[in-house]
């Protein structure tokens, strides 16, 4: 039997085994290059050297770190083990324990007169404090042990060892810093920088969202990642919590900006703009903000708007479906992972997916084996994942940002909305249809809000700072001559940029020229932000001026006031149409009681023969800036009057509001409600 017959026979035997009842042979990869992750994994295992086994003790690991340094302080044995230990040791033992072991080793070496080993330990401590200066402030005991170490060096070490403890040798390395800002235009320039949402180009909006995302991503530390993996929550990790809150805020901002438009065609224009923003984010490889924007567009409160989606072009619908498929959680985000593996240059990951990988790696194996030795491959795998994220933080973004536009976006994202409020707006725009409608083709990614509920309400100091920055930017661009005021037209367009514009938050009626000073604009923004961010939309009352025929007390004053009770022919006050709350004219801004809508009026349009509520006519300029000034309360389209949330009263006729259909006379309160108000 020659060689060919032998090969043929062996091939037939293998084929017979594979084709029979035995297990099929696994497919092999031939003539293909390994992935970068496979290469880094193999190189890391080679760098482990004598510790390439599955386990080692803490003392063995520490001894290997000491031997990395020579007499001149150079790393002659590589730095992989050293960096891995200094980064990952806090996952298995406190940093104070590691410092105490180093102090004990130094004292033992000094007793044995081993000056080289003493010098190596000093180099290790200096390297640790230089590359990880933040660890000293994280454990109270660590700083005391480090001080004891350098005190011991000053007493028992030579001149070379004592010089390493000098504060001038413990400088922390400078990081890449935040991405650069684009200088704002000077006052002498005639051209304004538009701070209007409709005037912002898709490229411009995507760049500024990427700037905010990268700045938030850069602030995340390894300690934040460790805290999340060990605790399973972002609580107690400020930078990580801020990054998650930013993503959730962007998602909800997209939803409310869509719902802020009154007509389906106008909402479709906002949808189309955000779809183009998402496409640009995909080109910039900013996948985290892409997840937030796409999640907002695919949210059920938005995807149910059938009348609005009808106005989208086929190209926009196709683009949204492609982005949704890219970020789908199917098969553990397989599509996104393939796309991410092929990306180069600047890129920002979906943070939730990569944190999920860290948790999976941590939970897969124990920290220590049954004999008490450390499970080294687990620490090394976690370290490699952390290094990938750290390398992304050292990137240089390809775009810059305008400070004024950042102030506009920052204040817009500060506003807080609950799921109930967003759904309330959605059903007000397009009420439920009794007929069965086909399901939406859009599938929202599961990880859109991967840390549910992490949308922190900004405190008053933060809101005040952001409002002050925005007002400064507004007057710099819209009052270049320095008159100290902006026109009513500019104010209308600016106020429509914010999501709270859809809740009827208008300023007091203007007289004369109608211009707004710096103080008035600041007061308006602070008041509107406080209502939306702290009190919530449920505190907005639909006040209407009425004449009380029976003695009635002001709910805000809590009794009679100097002008007497609210009754009589000339005693006029204000009553909320939804909950029946009464108050004086000058007290309607001080009402801090939640509007509890009566059950008989909630979602009930009334009998068929009843007169309908005031209904605003659609604006003539669909999608224009003037259309943005058309605002409504959450229940306008479902049967409630348009009202001001600034004064919490019905809107008065002014030049900057839509024309109103004449409203029928208000129905007098029933006898039961009158008795309850007495």
UniProtKB/Swiss-Prot annotation:
**UniProt-annotated stretches for the region Disordered:** 1-33, 165-185, 598-620, 651-678
This entry's Gene Ontology molecular function terms read:
calcium ion binding; diacylglycerol binding; guanyl-nucleotide exchange factor activity; zinc ion binding
Q: Where is the Ras-GEF domain?
A: 201-432
Segments forming domain EF-hand: 466-501
What are the entry keywords?
A: Calcium, Cell membrane, Cytoplasm, Differentiation, Guanine-nucleotide releasing factor, Lipid-binding, Membrane, Metal-binding, Zinc, Zinc-finger
Could you tell me in which tissues this protein is expressed?
A: Expressed by mast cells and their progenitors (at protein level).
N-terminal Ras-GEF domain boundaries: 49-175
- PANTHER family assigned: GUANINE NUCLEOTIDE EXCHANGE FACTOR, RAS GUANYL-RELEASING PROTEIN 4
Please provide the record's free-text comment about the domains of this protein: The phorbol-ester/DAG-type zinc finger mediates the binding and the functional activation by DAG.
Question: What is the documented function of this protein?
Answer: Functions as a cation- and diacylglycerol (DAG)-regulated nucleotide exchange factor activating Ras through the exchange of bound GDP for GTP. In neutrophils, participates in a phospholipase C-activating N-formyl peptide-activated GPCR (G protein-coupled receptor) signaling pathway by promoting Ras-mediated activation of PIK3CG/PI3Kgamma to promote neutrophil functional responses.
What's the name of the protein? RAS guanyl-releasing protein 4
- Please give the organism: Rattus norvegicus
Q: Corresponding gene?
A: Rasgrp4
